[in-house]
């Protein structure tokens, strides 16, 4: 390689240590990572070179391949860069593009996870390195030494600074090749699945660039070309496809959410009632335990009661109970008055109608045998469950139990279920309400019960 000619854009023949020959356009040389990148690469296989694993040639043309410097055996220049025709320095020219001379390097397209690569406007170091390789993944710190780009033309003058910088890169690359040094940064990148088809190296594993390189700070905005506009149109159409397919994906996701697992009770189809919760028997305190700001004042509470009146009333009650027990033990006219149901009923009727004791008198044995204190003691029938529960609530207070709500969804229609009206099990279908709920799903007035249709039950003896 001569020191005065830059080889960016030259056709390079590269032979790896696995005796595989590649041909492509020299893209860039990274001295930090000891890598060489070729664009439009084609593999010719091992050909007739002696090797343990002969590889046939391939017809595919790879967009770019990054080679590790320690695995390169030989690197020769097949064709020099094509001559560049620059426009005259005319201040009237704002922007220019060459479409015919860049046919071999246009239509690069987009590269999926690596982003869209701009097209080559010319075989210039700035357009090749600054524009395209910033989206591929080579470190951008080594890309700043390949020249600058003028703002009024699409070509670059190849200056002596470019050639000298390239000479330094090639010399350092030769030294690294002789030493056999490989970049430690590429070791974790060898097994990347995104570049297995696009990047091929001479080693057993394929290295893949992962870090997105920076653009050259000295290069200005690239000039648009016809292929660049075509790439933008292609991206616009791809974005429209994504926007159109997104509602379809959301619809499929919603449909998957609406699917009911097998064995679960289906919801009513003709639900008429909304959420009918809030009919709980006893309200559940959700604010936690009560917090008292100060201690209970027993002295002021005791001052509100008259101890003498309480003691007098208590002794009167004890005396009345003793008199009652004595009278029950003594027979009246040879018969126990409590055993005669007729006399008891008549006495009860007279006591209720006339009220001989008066409102302030609880017991007077001269007027009546019965008192006004324990009026429920003489009842022969047992109290009902509702009455006993009411008395317990009045005496001991209301127990605060969780999960006593009576509500739930009371939809009327479809093949719903009416489970959960009782305390535990359901009354229809397979749905069983949790224990303690009186509600639950109360659908199911239609369907199997035929509640919405008029019919007559016929028996063997007639309607």
UniProtKB/Swiss-Prot annotation:
One Pfam family recorded for the sequence: LSM14
Residues with Phosphothreonine modification: 194
Motif stretch (TFG box): 380-400
Classification via Gene3D superfamilies: 2.30.30.100
Compositionally biased spans, kind Polar residues: 147-185, 194-203
Record function comment: Essential for formation of P-bodies, cytoplasmic structures that provide storage sites for translationally inactive mRNAs and protect them from degradation. Acts as a repressor of mRNA translation. May play a role in mitotic spindle assembly.
Protein name in UniProt: Protein LSM14 homolog A
Organism in which the protein naturally occurs: Homo sapiens
